[in-house]
From Swiss-Prot:
Keywords: Aminoacyl-tRNA synthetase, ATP-binding, Cytoplasm, Ligase, Nucleotide-binding, Protein biosynthesis. InterPro entries: aa-tRNA-synth_II, aa-tRNA-synth_II/BPL/LPL, Anticodon-bd, Anticodon-bd_dom_sf, His-tRNA-ligase, HisRS-like_core, HisRS/HisZ, HisRS_anticodon. Its main location: cytoplasm. It comes from Microcystis aeruginosa (strain NIES-843 / IAM M-2473). Belongs to the class-II aminoacyl-tRNA synthetase family. It catalyses: tRNA(His) + L-histidine + ATP = L-histidyl-tRNA(His) + AMP + diphosphate + H(+). It is an enzyme of class 6 (ligase). GO terms for molecular function: ATP binding; histidine-tRNA ligase activity. GO terms for biological process: histidyl-tRNA aminoacylation. This is Histidine--tRNA ligase. The lineage of its organism: Bacteria, Bacillati, Cyanobacteriota, Cyanophyceae, Oscillatoriophycideae. HAMAP family: His_tRNA_synth (MF_00127). It is found in: Cytoplasm. GO terms for cellular component: cytoplasm. Homodimer.
Amino acid sequence: MGEIQAIRGTKDILPAEVGYWQWLEETASRILGTALYQEIRTPIFEQTQLFERGIGEATDVVGKEMYTFLDRRQRSLTLRPEGTAGVVRAYIEHKLQAAGGVQRLWYKGPMFRYERPQAGRQRQFHQIGVELLGSDDPRADVEVITLASEILKAVGLENLKLDINSLGNAQDRQNYRQALLDYLTPYKADLDADSQQRLEKNPLRILDSKDEKTKIICENVPSILEHLGSDSQKHFERVQSLLTDLGVIYNLNPCLVRGLDYYTHTAFEIQSDDLGAQATVCGGGRYDGLIAQLGGLDTPAVGWAIGLERLIILLQQKQSLSFLVPDFYLVSKGEKAEARSVVLAQQLRGLGFSVELDLSGSAFGKQFKRADRAKAVGCIILGDAEAENGTVQLKWMATQEQISLTQADLLTQAGELKAQISRHKS
């Protein structure tokens, strides 16, 4: 039997990379916490009909990309291709709307789509997302947009570009549908096969086509912004006004429709030139009809999702993993010293230091080389003599300065040692 490897489109996240993920997730959690968003965790698989009804059967996601299977009771289940539908299902099932007011939720975790794997895009991929449920106020749209921008800036993204559009309400889209048909029908033979099928079912989806020829045809389509009713127009104008008040630069993109059918009114994407062809790092919008469509009360909502794989690529290029550098590397030689090293390492960790304990039992010279490779700030040296008299040797690796101090002082001078570690790291 040949070697068993990870399935194409999936990726092992190895220890050297996990630190980036943890830092990114912790940064997002901290920023979302300042706006009182609460984390929600939903199952990785759901009933298939949740996504068919929620995302839309005419979308690429439902039609081509979902991982769907029958369980032993012949129920059709699907690995979640996105996070919003599951959050909405939980919101309805657990009657979260009964609490009244606005619910601010966020999630993180893996999603699954059968797409062509490439850099920053896997078949199992990860997202952080937010959902603000219970408000149709344009301020809600702006709140989630600015939170996304704040997170992206906090993790080092530069050259951000915000594209916004309005998809209006159901009546607006019905009016626009006819204008689209009038424009696109003469080009039907030149459209890609998928777009030809969508022409009658859902022509708005054609604007989301990735086919180059179809994209050229769509460059001169009528703008949906010219077909908005007065209420939709007022909502979108208010969103733009609030963004301007905040100093947020945005670009009106009337071809921005997103890839999922549940979007209404405001739709947006945040892109970064730092990521080249895969420039979109965050996408979202308002989905005022989805909760009622899935059996809940008529409840407005808005949200977004950030794809983590693309951000991780950028972080690896821009950020050093200084948070994975041990404060101390503890070397020991001799039976008594090795026994004492276990206790000392645990005591230091209890004081908040990161400590790597050398377990090799090899000569001090080899242990010192491993301390160098670990990029430790300090090396604590413990031989049998030190174990006997209650001392240690502390060597600062950057300067090679070495001092002798008692083990008691090492533990009681934690504040001073942390200050020295900070100076050596900077």
